């Protein structure tokens, strides 16, 4: 099965009405300025993929190799460069612009992003554990609980406090509500991972 993919920037969430009058929550993703920087083939690279660049970057913030790589595609250096595998290579050439119209309303996609970081958090917030009783005589409120018995070490996999969020997350089978080519925007039903203005990768669903 061939895959279609595009890079975008999460703008935020809003609501739209369907033709039936149903109110649908959607995430707005800006997907303009996607350019094919490189086409990777089985002969040269050992696998097939296209390399997309997204979000123009000022030249003062880049280096010579990045400028030269972008110049081969007749474009400016890009802030984000990602690969999309399992595509139909015959449909792409270096320098082509990939737009929102590769998807249409009703398509299902997988969206990958970086979840919001929450810093160091305790077991209750991080792992969804129950707290202890809050009564006057209790001395156990929000602690992580027993470390186990007998052996003098903590078992692997024990749910403990630590850094929360900031992970690569993929949400599968999200529906495209609208593909606005004129404004370079995709409206995706529901929420997608990450904070506003963060990078998301949108690909055809695999399931």
UniProtKB/Swiss-Prot annotation:
Gene3D superfamilies recorded: 3.30.160.810, Translation factors
GO biological process, one term: translation
Any one GO CC term of the record: cytosolic large ribosomal subunit
Region (Disordered): 119-143
UniProt-listed Pfam families: Ribosomal_L3
Keyword Transcription regulation: no
A GO MF term: rRNA binding
Keyword entries, A-Z: Ribonucleoprotein, Ribosomal protein, RNA-binding, rRNA-binding
Domain of life assignment: Bacteria
Subunit structure: Part of the 50S ribosomal subunit. Forms a cluster with proteins L14 and L19.
Functional summary from the UniProt entry: One of the primary rRNA binding proteins, it binds directly near the 3'-end of the 23S rRNA, where it nucleates assembly of the 50S subunit.
Family that this chain belongs to: Belongs to the universal ribosomal protein uL3 family.
NCBIfam families assigned to the protein according to its UniProt record, in alphabetical order: L3_bact
Protein name: Large ribosomal subunit protein uL3
Species this protein is from: Ligilactobacillus salivarius (strain UCC118)
């Amino acid at each position: 099965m061939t895959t279609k993919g595009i890079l975008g920037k999460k703008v935020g969430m809003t609501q739209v009405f369907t033709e039936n009058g149903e109110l649908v929550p959607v995430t707005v993703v800006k997907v303009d300025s996607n350019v094919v920087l490189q086409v990777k083939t089985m002969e040269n690279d050992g696998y097939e993929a296209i390399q997309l660049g997204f979000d123009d970057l000022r030249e003062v913030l880049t280096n010579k190799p990045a400028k030269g790589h972008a110049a081969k595609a007749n474009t400016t250096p890009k802030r984000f460069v990602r690969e999309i595998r399992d595509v139909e290579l015959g449909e792409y050439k270096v320098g082509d612009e990939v737009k929102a119209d590769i998807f249409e309303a009703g398509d299902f996609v997988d969206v990958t992003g970086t979840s919001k970081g929450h810093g160091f958090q305790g077991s209750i917030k991080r792992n969804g554990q129950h707290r202890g009783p809050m009564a006057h005589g209790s001395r156990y409120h929000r602690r992580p609980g027993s470390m186990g018995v007998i052996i003098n070490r903590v078992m692997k996999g024990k749910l403990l406090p630590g850094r929360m969020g900031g992970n690569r997350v993929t949400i599968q089978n999200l529906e495209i509500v609208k593909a606005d080519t004129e404004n370079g925007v995709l409206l995706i039903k529901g929420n997608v991972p990450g904070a506003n203005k963060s990078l998301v990768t949108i690909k055809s669903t695999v399931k």
